[in-house]
Each structure stands twice: as C-alpha cells, then as structure tokens.
Amino acid sequence: MTHLYWVALKSIWAKEINRFMRIWVQTLVPPVITMTLYFIIFGNLIGSRIGEMHGFTYMQFIVPGLIMMAVITNAYANVASSFFSAKFQRNIEELLVAPVPTHVIIAGYVGGGVARGLCVGILVTAISLFFVPFQVHSWLFVALTLLLTAILFSLAGLLNAVFAKTFDDISLIPTFVLTPLTYLGGVFYSLTLLPPFWQALSHLNPIVYMISGFRFGFRGITDVPLFTTVAVLVVFIIAFYLLCWYLIQRRPRPRWIRYQHSR
C-alpha cells in the first residue's frame, strides 16, 4: 500500500506542478512584474528619501519582505484555485472515492502550492539582484522560514477552497484578510517605528513573524524572537492541517458534494 500511496502522491504533485507551469505566463510572470514595480517605486524612487533602517538601505530592508509576500500570495492562490476548480467540475469526487488517504491528498495539493511559491520566490530573488547585492546571513533560517510559510499558506488556500461555494468566494479571503495582514506585517517598515500600542497589536499578526524571520535570514535583523517565529509557524501549520484533514475526511459525501447534488 505504501507504494500505491507514493504513486498517488507523485501523481497529484505532477498534476499540480504541470498545471501552473503550463500557464507560466499567467502564474509566474505577473508576480515578478508586480514585485519589480515595488522595487522600482518603493526601493529606488521613495527609498532614496527615507534613509537607512537598522543599518541597511531602505531597498535592502524591504527586499526580504517583498520576496515573502510573493511566496505567500502564490502558494495560497495555487491551492485555492486548483482545489476549487476540481471541486466545481466535480473531478474531486473521483479522488475522494479512490483508495487514497486524506493525508496524501492534502500533501499533494500542498506540494503543488509550495512548488509555485518557491518558484516565484526564486524568480523575485533573481530580479532583486538588479537592485541590491546578494547577502545571506543564515541559509538555514532563509530555507526554514520560506518552506514553512509556503506550507502554511498552501494549507490556508486549501481551507478557502473547501469552504468556497463560488469562484467569488476564492477572492474574498485574499482581498479582505490576506492583503491587509501582509501590508501590515512589516514588509515596508520596522515595528520599532510604531508606537507601543501598535507594536503590541502588530504581534497579533502572524505574518509579522514570517517576514521578520525571513528578514533575519537575509540581513541578520528581526523585530521578534526567532523561536517565536518558528513556534507560530509550526502551530498554525498543525492547526490548519488538522482542520483540512477533518473537512476532507468527511467522506464519501462531504459538505461540498452534498451542496453540488442539492443544486
């Protein structure tokens, strides 16, 4: 059975990776263009007037946050759109009735989201080299934070797809939750610039820990303890994974299949 599960996992991975690579002009190019505009506008044009932050130029300061923002957005979008499309077309029913454990299904879709997030992250990092010199303080923390964040938001995208009933529902969470939390997560500023009340409030934003941890990997500076960063990521991953497992485990007629039959 282990061989069967491995074949199923590789098949889902291959399907998910081929899906976004087949339309790479739509999935990989737009985020790179968007981040390039951020580099030009906020880094070159505005950053030259802001000055240094923690001993680094403003461009050097925001690059890790912009890379992480691209990874978050694309890992989330890949799984949310792919799983909901399969659900909408009722292709997911074939997977749910197959002798494939729920863990394998989740790992397959999450693997696709992580792959897209990492691809975009690498491309954005390559573009950033035209603006700032490449500098890494801790390869371990760069890789760890990047991987855990991509896994977390792939799981979040899966949750969104499970609950969504229409394609409009897919855009609600990114628009009203993900985007505000990302922009308020310390991408463009250090938490030390905020008044004490807003600093304390910012610590309730989980994206703050991801961006601070990733920035530490590149620059060696952070606004939050590193142990807290890893702990927050691990706790959220476990919670989201268990919730995804519970919702998908409700077979053979989960809530979304009953919804389709009731229409």
Label each residue range with its predicted role.
Residues 20, 182-240:
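Membrane-interfacial helix-loop-helix junctions in multi-pass membrane proteins
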Residues 22-48, 62-73, 179, 232-239:
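Hydrophobic alpha-helical transmembrane segments of multi-pass membrane transport/permease proteins
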Residues 23-26, 61-65, 72-77, 107-109, ...:
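Short alpha-helical transmembrane interface motifs in multi-pass membrane proteins
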Residues 29-33, 166-185:
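Pore- or pathway-lining transmembrane helices of multi-pass membrane proteins that form conduits
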Residues 102-174, 221-245:
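Alpha-helical transmembrane segments and their short interhelical loops
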Residues 1-32, 254-257, 261-262:
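Aromatic- and glycine-rich beta-strand/loop motifs that create alpha-glucan
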Residues 35, 39-43, 212-263:
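Alpha-helical transmembrane segments of multi-pass membrane transporters/translocases
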Residues 33-38, 58-130, 157, 175-176, ...:
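Hydrophobic alpha-helical transmembrane segments of multi-pass membrane transport proteins
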